[in-house]
Structure formats: structure tokens, C-alpha cells
């Protein structure tokens, strides 16, 4: 085996090159790779956190939407109940007012009927007295006659 000085020189140059690379080139390259690896890992973690946060936000939004819909449904239901209650109250008030008006009208009719009966009795009594005076054409005691007519009128 012939070893040339060139081969030994190349081996020494290669060893110096390797040592130089290990000492000065390799650490910054490794540091850059580690920093890049850390950035990628941080980015993936951030993306994972963002995904979880997005899912959580979507769940919260869906829950709030559901609660809002339930509240809206409750408000609408309460409004319907209140409207129905107001309608029922108005119907009851109208019915009571109608009954009161009917009773008032009945009372007025009864009063008018009584007044008309009294007026009729008075007129009948006056006509009876006039008729009796003409028939008898005599003097009858006015007080007794009036008493008899009042009794007859009361019987009518």
C-alpha cells in the first residue's frame, strides 16, 4: 500500500475541515434547526389552541343562541298569555257592563211601568168620577167618592 503524501494531506485537510465545521459551522446550523423546530412546534401548539378556542367559542355561541331562543320563546309565550288575559278581562268587563246596563234598563222600564200604571189609575179614577157624577147628577160626598175610587184603582 502506497500512501502518498497527497492522500495524507487530503486526510489532514479533511480532518481540519471536519473539525472546523464541528467547531464553527455545526453549532449555528443546529441552533437554527432547533429554533426552527421550536417555532414550528409553537405554531402547531398555537394552531391547536386556536382550534380548541374556536370550538369552545362555537359551543358557547351555540349555547347562547339556544338560550336566546328559549328566552325569546318564553317572552313570546308570556306576551300571548298576557294578551289572552287582557282579552278575557275585556270580555268579562264587557259582559259585566252589559249586565249592568240591562239591569239599569230593566229598573228604568219597571219605574216607567209603575209610573204609567199610576197615571192610568189616576186617569181611570178621574174618568170614573166624571162618569159617575154625570150618571147620578147628584151631589155625592166628594171625599167618600174619592176613597171608593182609590180603592178600585188600587185593585186594578
Curated annotation (Swiss-Prot):
Residue ranges of the TM segments: 5-25
Alphabetical list of SUPFAM superfamilies matching this protein: F1F0 ATP synthase subunit B, membrane domain
Entry keyword annotation includes Cell membrane: yes
Pfam families: ATP-synt_B
GO cellular component: plasma membrane; proton-transporting ATP synthase complex
GO MF: proton-transporting ATP synthase activity, rotational mechanism; proton-transporting ATPase activity, rotational mechanism
Keyword list, A-Z: ATP synthesis, Cell inner membrane, Cell membrane, CF(0), Hydrogen ion transport, Ion transport, Membrane, Transmembrane, Transmembrane helix, Transport
Localisation per UniProt entry: Cell inner membrane
Gene3D superfamilies named in the record: 6.10.250.1580
Membrane topology classification: Single-pass membrane protein
Top-rank lineage group of the source organism: Bacteria
Keyword field contains Protein biosynthesis: no
Role, per record: F(1)F(0) ATP synthase produces ATP from ADP in the presence of a proton or sodium gradient. F-type ATPases consist of two structural domains, F(1) containing the extramembraneous catalytic core and F(0) containing the membrane proton channel, linked together by a central stalk and a peripheral stalk. During catalysis, ATP synthesis in the catalytic domain of F(1) is coupled via a rotary mechanism of the central stalk subunits to proton translocation. Component of the F(0) channel, it forms part of the peripheral stalk, linking F(1) to F(0).
Subunit structure: F-type ATPases have 2 components, F(1) - the catalytic core - and F(0) - the membrane proton channel. F(1) has five subunits: alpha(3), beta(3), gamma(1), delta(1), epsilon(1). F(0) has three main subunits: a(1), b(2) and c(10-14). The alpha and beta chains form an alternating ring which encloses part of the gamma chain. F(1) is attached to F(0) by a central stalk formed by the gamma and epsilon chains, while a peripheral stalk is formed by the delta and b chains.
Similarity comment text for this entry: Belongs to the ATPase B chain family.
Protein name in UniProt: ATP synthase subunit b
Source organism (scientific name): Chromohalobacter salexigens (strain ATCC BAA-138 / DSM 3043 / CIP 106854 / NCIMB 13768 / 1H11)
Gene (UniProt): atpF
Amino acid at each position: 500500500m502506497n500512501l502518498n503524501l497527497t492522500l495524507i494531506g487530503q486526510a489532514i485537510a479533511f480532518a481540519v475541515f471536519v473539525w472546523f465545521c464541528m467547531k464553527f459551522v455545526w453549532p449555528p446550523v443546529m441552533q437554527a434547526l432547533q429554533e426552527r423546530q421550536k417555532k414550528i412546534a409553537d405554531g402547531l401548539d398555537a394552531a391547536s389552541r386556536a382550534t380548541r378556542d374556536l370550538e369552545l367559542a362555537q359551543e358557547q355561541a351555540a349555547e347562547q343562541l339556544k338560550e336566546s331562543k328559549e328566552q325569546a320563546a318564553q317572552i313570546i309565550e308570556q306576551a300571548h298569555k298576557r294578551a289572552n288575559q287582557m282579552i278575557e278581562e275585556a270580555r268579562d268587563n264587557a259582559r259585566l257592563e252589559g249586565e249592568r246596563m240591562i239591569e239599569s234598563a230593566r229598573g228604568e222600564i219597571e219605574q216607567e211601568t209603575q209610573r204609567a200604571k199610576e197615571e192610568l189609575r189616576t186617569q181611570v179614577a178621574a174618568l170614573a168620577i166624571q162618569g159617575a157624577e154625570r150618571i147620578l147628577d147628584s151631589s155625592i160626598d166628594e171625599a167618600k167618592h174619592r176613597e171608593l175610587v182609590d180603592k178600585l184603582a188600587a185593585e186594578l
